[in-house]
Regions:
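Terminal amphipathic helices with adjacent charged low-complexity linkers/tails
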Residues: 86-114, 237-274
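Short, surface-exposed secondary-structure junctions/capping segments
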Residues: 116-119, 226, 230, 274
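Short coil/turn segments at secondary-structure boundaries
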Residues: 153-156, 233, 258-259, 287-291
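A glycine-rich phosphate-binding loop feature that marks nucleotide/adenosyl-phosphate handling sites
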Residues: 156-161, 235-238, 292, 303
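Long, K/E/R/D-enriched contiguous segments that form extended
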Residues: 263-303
Length: 303
């Protein structure tokens, strides 16, 4: 967690950091060009301004700097499978390989912040419109249409919608760091169990969801013996988990679009009603602000 910031000093988002034996580079998008320049000033790190002409992607850069027959190490828990697939294509001309490493666990021992574990709770059905059990049945029907019997959900916003699960692991975003494995008759939520409120645990169990430890995801999926065709979207499932799924002989992995994306986009009547109410409240707040602003300006107040 936050290992990119620890090694590079850069505090932005949507970034990659590459280190070779002789050089290093960090990627930043347009929101962070100025910040990144300041934070890496005085170091050997090159700033790669994403989207600028002539600036290679992290994948292209790795393909260029990796020596013939070289090995690229990466943390498979923080790199999605689609990124790794792109890396493999770039490394192929040099017969390069990829290896999952967890070097930050060895190098960053002291002072490392804990993984976010804000209280996890369940959004009531009166706001969500459907219970977790109802949404799980809807998902299973969609999976059947796509020729699958199971799914590994790794995208946090999709998981939040599926189980009505809420937390504050990401500032200003109500997500909980977790995974969910859904089969025709089971749903397993991999999450730090101590953070789940008693009410949320009871609600999940009542809706057919069992809890497992967050860190047991790799061992848990490796231990699955029930044959399943598992939908796992490479763009939203990390490489380490995807590898475990592919290496389990009981599981057939299908890389396809996550049906939850479209499902959560279709708002039910309860959600629509709350959206309308929210827009009305926003409108009232905006009008009050404009009136206050105009009155202060009219009185000659300097703002």
């Amino acid at each position: 967690y936050t290992s990119l910031t620890y090694f590079s000093g850069f505090h932005g988002e949507n970034s990659n950091f590459v280190v070779t034996m002789t050089e290093s580079a960090v990627w930043a998008d347009g929101r962070y060009f100025v910040q990144a320049e300041k934070e890496i000033a005085g170091t050997e790190i090159q700033l790669m301004r994403m989207g600028e002409p002539g600036v290679p992607t992290a994948e292209e850069y790795c393909g260029k700097v990796l020596p013939e027959g070289g090995t690229l190490g990466l943390c498979g828990l923080t790199a999605n499978c689609a990124l790794v697939n792109n890396l493999k294509k770039e490394l192929e001309p040099k017969h390069g390989s990829i290896k999952t490493l967890f070097l930050e666990d060895e190098l960053w021992v002291e002072g490392r912040p804990a993984r976010p574990a804000t209280p996890a709770w369940i959004l009531p059905k009166e706001y969500a419109g459907f219970s977790p059990a109802e949404k799980l049945e809807q998902l299973r029907a969609k999976l059947k249409e796509q020729g699958c019997t199971a799914q590994l959900v790794g995208k946090l916003d999709n998981l939040a919608w599926l189980l009505n699960l809420r937390a504050m692991d990401i500032e200003c975003t109500p997500y909980a760091m977790a995974y969910c494995y859904v089969t025709p008759d089971r749903a397993v939520l991999f999450i730090d169990q101590a953070r789940v409120t008693p009410e949320a645990k009871a609600e999940l169990e009542a809706n057919g969801v069992t809890l497992a430890d967050y860190d047991s995801i790799l061992d848990g999926m490796a231990a699955e013996t029930e044959p399943q065709t598992v939908l796992a979207e490479s763009a939203t499932v990390n490489y380490a988990v995807y590898q475990v799924l592919e290496n389990n002989p009981a599981l057939t992995v299908k890389d396809a679009a996550d049906p939850l994306l479209a499902m959560k986009g279709v708002k039910n009547e309860v959600e629509l009603a709350h959206l309308r109410e929210s827009h009305l409240r926003d409108a009232v707040a905006m009008v009050r602000f404009q009136i206050e602003l105009e009155n202060r300006l009219a009185s000659g107040e300097e703002l």
